[in-house]
Amino acid sequence: MQDGQRTAEDVDALARQVITDGGHGEWFRHRLGHGIGLDVHEPPYLDRGDRRRLVRGMCFTVEPSVFIPGRLGARTEDVVVVGGDEGGRLLTRYRRDLQVVA
């Protein structure tokens, strides 16, 4: 993600579209993420209505989730930093293979 290119609301909308295109839009009921700084949950909020521009150095979570009542729930969480011309930087390092818990 590049400095000043998108708002928090834009990023949320992009993620919602991907989840909707995958057939799970109605089950994505939470905001996409939030800022991390002096507090663990702070602005900007990656959600509808937050029109703040994301600028270089901002740190936030990206945590899309799908919860289908009585069936399943899934959430991933990454921490990212908005970059300059080079784009953003992913700070989270963990395995990406799917783990099914029955």
Each model region followed by its residue ranges:
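Active-site neighborhoods and metal-handling regions in enzymes and metal-associated proteins
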Residues: 1-102
